[in-house]
From Swiss-Prot:
Name recorded for this polypeptide: Co-chaperone protein HscB
One cellular component term from this protein's GO annotations in UniProt: iron-sulfur cluster transfer complex
Name of one Pfam family that matches: HSCB_C
Record's keyword annotation contains Plastid: no
Tagged with keyword Chaperone: yes
Record-linked CDD domains: DnaJ
Keywords, comma-separated and alphabetical: Chaperone
Family annotation (NCBIfam families): hscB, PRK05014.1
Family membership: Belongs to the HscB family.
SUPFAM superfamilies xrefs: Chaperone J-domain, HSC20 (HSCB), C-terminal oligomerisation domain
């Protein structure tokens, strides 16, 4: 059973996080291992396994990139374990330049420049994210998979920039 079916939701990128959370809590109450403490060992084991599946499904579906990766996996794209890389040299050069810029900002400890950088990366991410949403809705799986790969780069860059921001604010 796929995670969307487990939560009683359509297999779609766009979903209600509130509905997902409510369904998660319902399933957790229903299958929590403590409810099976006096049950036979086989039922206890099944409850633990089902609870673990529910938790994994929750973690996967509540985060935008992992939800997109999972949806793509249902259509034959195993992005989590693949060795396929981004082949767009212009994009890769842009990433390299952005990484270098982030390093320079870190060395200069320039908070104002970092704030502008974070906004710029967020805008790049948001633009690609919107493209990915459209590609998933249109079921252009190859293009969506490529966009998800690029979003991973931007997500890591954003995380690095936010870590630098925390580091600079601690000083």
């Amino acid at each position: 059973m796929d995670y969307f079916t487990l939560f009683g939701l359509p297999a779609s990128y766009t979903l209600s996080l509130e509905q997902l959370a409510v369904r998660y809590q319902d399933l957790q109450r229903q299958y929590h291992p403590d409810k099976f403490a006096s049950a036979p060992a086989a039922e206890q084991l099944a409850a633990v396994q089902h609870s673990a599946t529910i938790n994994q499904a929750w973690q996967t579906l509540r985060h935008p990139l992992t939800r997109a990766e999972y949806l793509l996996s249902l259509h034959g794209f195993d992005l989590a374990s693949e060795q396929h890389t981004v082949r767009d040299t212009a994009f890769l050069m842009e990433q390299l330049e952005l990484r270098e810029e982030l390093d320079e900002i870190g060395q200069a400890k320039d908070e104002a420049r970092l704030e502008a950088f974070i906004k710029r990366v967020k805008a790049l991410f948001d633009t690609r994210h919107q493209l990915m949403v459209e590609q998933l809705q249109n079921e252009t799986w190859d293009a969506a998979a490529d966009t998800v790969r690029k979003l991973r780069f931007l997500d890591k860059l954003r995380s690095s920039a936010e870590e630098l921001e925390e580091k600079l604010l601690d000083f």
